[in-house]
């Protein structure tokens, strides 16, 4: 609940930030509240289906849109090494996104990575 509260608080002063507090695995459920042709989509979920969620939510991005996807390997596969999980997630994203940057989050979140990607 803290993360959702913090996101809502930040969005109050940013009129172009639209927080979605919903099950990201089901974009059809919140499609009516999301603008089309977004320039950016930021995904920060803890789910084994992070790559599939990013692919499903691509529908909201403009053709030149960008996505920032926070990858949490232990949420995807607690038995695999983080590097293996990162590689697997990136492979799943390649049909939908071109990865332009990888940013380690180790200074604040061990074994987390942010992937910056543009729509293919």
Each language-model region and where it sits:
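C-terminal substrate-binding/active-site "lid" region of AdoMet-derived donor-dependent transferases
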Residues: 3-13, 55-119
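S-adenosyl-L-methionine
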Residues: 1-50
């Amino acid at each position: 609940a803290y993360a959702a509260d913090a996101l809502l608080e930040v969005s109050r002063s940013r009129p172009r930030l639209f927080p979605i507090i919903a099950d990201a695995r089901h974009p059809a459920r919140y499609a009516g509240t999301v603008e089309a042709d977004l320039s950016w989509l930021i995904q920060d979920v803890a789910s084994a289906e992070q790559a599939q969620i990013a692919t499903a939510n691509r529908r909201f991005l403009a053709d030149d849109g960008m996505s920032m996807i926070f990858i949490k390997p232990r949420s995807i596969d607690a038995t695999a090494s983080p590097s293996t999980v990162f590689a697997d997630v990136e492979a799943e994203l390649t049909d939908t996104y071109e990865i332009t940057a990888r940013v380690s989050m180790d200074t604040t979140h061990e074994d987390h990575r942010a992937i910056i990607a543009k729509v293919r």
